[in-house]
């Protein structure tokens, strides 16, 4: 009986071995950099990228949309020259979670390190962050970052050796813009921000001067701030028309038209002709550079994590601009406008500095009511990624087109960011909201509004957001004191098919504004039918044109506001030549 059992056991074991599937060799990558590009140990986010084509480098094909390629990220501390770092399944990936799940095939591979510096904050905390290097906080174009040239590889089940990737290239410095007759550039060291960050920190701006600035030395000018993402130079203004034979074969996927580069160039020249025309009102237009270690923009408010950018802009930068370029320097003569991030900023600075501005024009603003943080109610929902349901698991969308077709979900958006950086360091949209709005955590980094992997919302952080940055809530809470200072100053615009669902928060803001009394808000909320991001109030022209005309489209309303509200004796004539 024992011998029979032994024979059966051996036979069963042989059978098991025969049917066992062939083990898969997991692809792995060893990434390094030579001493020639950096002689010191490096801290940062190491990002491995793979693409199935070579139309562009993999670092330029990575995003959260349906056309994204593959990315995997991991933190490195003290990575030494020549040291090979193994990038395997411990790296966080999107849209494929693990390197071992990459399908067999041919790929182009590239690695890059977004290098961190150590900051000793005023709060006493020490953090490691990627400083802006003049590029506007972009990991894939940041000067000083090391990267490798792409090369072709094959991933298959018989791989036995790791693929070696050497980051032997360095992204070069950004060229500073030069002054012209009409566009000037200014940079100051901010005392407030330097104290906060523990090292010299600067604010910059591009200033568009009015026609006749030099020939009217006694004139002083109203000022308009055009808020938005990081401007490398003053955009949309050109003293030269585009060449008549300019290539128009370029295709804009966003707007579905060919030749958009020429359209933009023509609009820039048209703006110059209008700006310098006879009897055109003379203003200063300012675009601010306030990139920081968390994003290309500070949101122009004070923040526990980013610093007192609101006060630094208001009380350090603007006075210097108005001193150098003869601004009137009074609240009745300042206006602010912008779209998307710039729309939120325009409304926020008007609210937080109500006497210092005489009107805001906020187009497609980032969420201005956190009951609609896109499609998340941070006060009631339990999870940012999934709708609350006992049995059904339905993902929350984060991006759509004008027909409502979903192109990304909340989970995808945030997992994409998590590849680029932990601890709110991706330099992307959801992380900057967290960096601006959240309290500082015990480790010196922003407290998470929700778990970046699972989506679970932290209600205590949500309450902090509410009291400090929920613009609708703050207006409603403080209308008794704010209302008299904001009457007639609030103008909000949004497409009703905004790609990021920003119209939902605008609906909620409008519902409150309609109820205001003592005083009634006396402003404007308007919507573009079937209009996507970022509709700005133009019912006549298509979005691809109106988005290029911010610096002129609100002028009639601004001039009317000045006529109605300028104090007695104010200078409303010297700049009308």
Positions of PLM-derived features:
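N-terminal processing/targeting junctions
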Residues: 12-15, 28, 214-216, 315
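Contiguous beta-strand segments within globular domains
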Residues: 24-33, 39-47, 200-206, 225
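Bacterial Sec-dependent N-terminal signal peptides
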Residues: 1-27
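Non-catalytic cap/lid and distal C-terminal segments of serine-dependent acyl enzymes
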Residues: 52-92, 97-577
């Amino acid at each position: 009986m024992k011998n029979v059992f032994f024979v059966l056991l051996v036979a069963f074991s042989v059978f098991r071995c025969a049917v066992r599937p062939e083990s898969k060799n997991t692809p792995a990558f060893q990434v390094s950099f030579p001493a020639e590009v950096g002689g010191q140990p490096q801290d940062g986010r190491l990002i491995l990228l793979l693409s199935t084509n070579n139309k562009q480098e993999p670092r330029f094909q990575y995003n959260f949309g349906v056309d994204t390629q593959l990315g995997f990220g991991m933190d490195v501390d003290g990575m030494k020259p020549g040291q090979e770092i193994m990038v395997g399944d411990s790296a966080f990936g999107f849209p494929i979670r693990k390197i071992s799940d990459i399908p067999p095939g041919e790929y182009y591979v590239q690695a890059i390190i977004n290098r961190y510096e150590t900051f000793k904050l005023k709060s006493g905390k020490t953090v490691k962050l990627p400083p802006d290097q003049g590029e506007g906080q972009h990991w894939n174009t940041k000067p000083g970052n090391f990267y490798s040239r792409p090369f072709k590889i094959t991933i298959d089940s018989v791989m036995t050796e790791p693929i070696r990737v050497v980051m032997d290239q360095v992204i070069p410095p950004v060229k500073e813009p030069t002054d012209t007759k009409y566009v000037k550039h200014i940079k100051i060291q901010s005392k407030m921000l330097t104290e906060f960050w523990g090292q010299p920190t600067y604010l910059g701006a591009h200033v568009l001067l009015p026609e006749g600035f030099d020939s009217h030395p006694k004139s002083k000018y109203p000022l308009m701030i055009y808020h938005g993402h990081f401007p490398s130079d003053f955009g949309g203004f050109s003293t030269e028309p585009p060449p008549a034979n300019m290539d128009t074969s370029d295709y804009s996927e966003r707007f579905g038209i060919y030749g958009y580069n020429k359209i933009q160039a023509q609009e820039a020249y048209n703006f110059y002709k209008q700006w310098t025309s006879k009897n055109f009102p003379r203003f200063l237009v300012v675009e601010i550079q306030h990139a920081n270690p968390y994003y290309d923009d500070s949101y122009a408010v004070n923040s526990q994590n980013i610093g007192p950018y609101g006060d630094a802009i208001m009380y350090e930068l603007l006075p210097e601009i108005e001193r150098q370029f003869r601004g009137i320097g009074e609240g009745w003569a300042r206006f602010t406008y912008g779209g998307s991030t710039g729309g939120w900023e325009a409304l926020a600075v008007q609210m937080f500095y109500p006497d210092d501005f005489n009107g805001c024009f906020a187009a497609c603003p980032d969420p201005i009511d956190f009951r609609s943080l896109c499609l998340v109610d941070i006060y009631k929902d339990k999870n940012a990624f999934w709708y609350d349901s006992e049995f059904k698991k339905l993902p929350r969308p984060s991006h759509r087109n004008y027909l409502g077709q979903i192109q990304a979900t909340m989970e995808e958006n945030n997992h994409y960011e998590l590849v680029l950086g932990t601890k709110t360091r991706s330099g992307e949209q959801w992380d900057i909201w967290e960096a601006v709005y959240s309290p500082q955590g015990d480790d010196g980094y922003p407290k998470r509004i929700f778990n970046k992997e699972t989506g679970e919302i932290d209600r205590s952080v949500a309450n902090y957001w509410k009291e400090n940055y929920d613009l609708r809530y703050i207006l409603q809470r403080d209308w008794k004191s704010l209302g008299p200072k904001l009457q007639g100053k609030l103008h909000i615009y949004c497409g009703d098919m905004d790609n990021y669902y920003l119209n939902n928060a605008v609906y909620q803001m409008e519902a409150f504004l309609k109820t205001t009394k003592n005083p009634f808000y006396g402003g404007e909320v308007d919507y573009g039918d079937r209009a996507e991001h970022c509709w700005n109030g133009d019912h006549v022209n298509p979005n691809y044109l109106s988005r290029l005309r911010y610096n002129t489209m609100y002028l009639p309303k601004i001039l009317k506001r000045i006529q109605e509200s300028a104090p007695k004796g104010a200078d409303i004539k010297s700049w009308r030549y």
